[in-house]
């Protein structure tokens, strides 16, 4: 195994968390609530309406191939624009739809104020700014989630959102992470960006083709133009000895096979990147898919500069994944 890569044998001990002394919400709360019915139909936000949300620092207008979307974000702890912010943690959520365009979950009952409160708690806990990045069609963002998720367009939009926020707030480096499809996006951006200090892939599919093959999803396999595979970009990941990558998963998972996550980690290790595979049998039944609390914790600790051994021990000492709405 190359230097900087490790399969984790976790030994637990309790760790106190660093606290921010003055992490204030950057985004402005409102009474807006998220609607699952709107997600099923597709969310449209006009450019002018998006400008009003931009003034509240909960949105950015992003264009790819001449078509724009109003993508939402919920932030706390940032120095006001134009910054500077030496580092900021950003989390990309997992899917909020299942196998049907009418099966929507996770965001129901939440709204802008709740998301800002969530990020404020994380910013205060870890002492660095925290942002929740809403993918197209979800958590208030415009777009049609059913047809955009997992696509090259989604990846391009989310990468462009990071660029807009980087410029707006003077972010020098990102600690970037995500759950499930958000973790897949995180892996994809390893090859697209030179400003990642941390990458946390939590219950993700960073070897997307291998995931489709393992699950026997032949319809998707027959349309490779409809998805992206971060494993195809492994040789384009820039070398950065300061960057740390954590691949977190539950070996019992039935949705994204852990072997596919292990294979991606091993490919990172073979190329000499500083990466750690973190197997945690802590996700809830029946699918063993959610480790969001663990991913957020790894992201906050890595972004705040905590040494790797303490990060791994903290994850080991945490209780099992709790029920939660946001992902």
Name each model feature, range by range.
Residues 123-141:
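Conserved alpha/beta-hydrolase
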Residues 177-186:
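Gly/Ala-rich beta-loop-alpha elbow adjacent to hydrolase catalytic centers
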Residues 185-227:
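Hydrolase active-site cap/lid region
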């Amino acid at each position: 195994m190359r230097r900087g890569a490790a399969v984790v044998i976790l030994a637990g001990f309790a760790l106190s968390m660093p606290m921010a002394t003055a992490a204030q919400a950057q985004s402005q709360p409102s009474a807006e609530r998220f609607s699952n019915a709107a997600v099923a139909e597709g969310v449209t936000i006009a450019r002018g309406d998006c400008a009003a949300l931009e003034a509240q620092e909960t949105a950015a207008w992003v264009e790819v191939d001449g078509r724009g979307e109003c993508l939402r974000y919920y932030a706390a702890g940032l120095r006001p624009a134009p910054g500077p912010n030496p580092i900021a943690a950003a989390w990309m959520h997992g899917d909020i739809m299942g196998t049907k365009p009418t099966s929507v979950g996770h965001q129901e009952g939440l709204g802008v104020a709740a998301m800002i409160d969530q990020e404020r708690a994380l910013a205060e806990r870890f002492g660095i700014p925290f942002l929740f990045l809403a993918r197209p069609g979800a958590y208030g963002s415009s777009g049609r989630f059913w047809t955009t998720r997992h696509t090259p367009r989604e990846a391009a939009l989310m990468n462009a959102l990071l660029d807009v926020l980087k410029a707006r707030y003077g972010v020098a480096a990102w600690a970037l992470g995500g759950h499930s499809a958000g973790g897949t996006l995180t892996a994809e951006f390893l090859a697209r960006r030179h400003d990642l200090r941390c990458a946390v892939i939590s219950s993700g599919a960073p070897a997307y083709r291998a995931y489709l093959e393992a699950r026997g999803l032949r319809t998707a396999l027959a349309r490779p133009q409809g998805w992206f595979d971060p494993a195809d970009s492994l040789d384009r990941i820039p070398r950065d000895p300061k960057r740390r990558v954590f691949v977190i998963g539950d070996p019992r998972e039935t949705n994204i096979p852990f072997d596919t996550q292990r294979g991606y980690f091993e490919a990172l290790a073979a190329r000499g990147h500083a990466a750690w595979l973190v197997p945690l049998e802590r996700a809830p039944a029946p699918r063993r898919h959610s480790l969001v609390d663990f991913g957020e914790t790894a992201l906050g600790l890595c972004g705040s500069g905590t040494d790797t051994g303490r990060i791994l021990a903290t994850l080991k000492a945490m209780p099992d994944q709790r029920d939660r709405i946001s992902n």
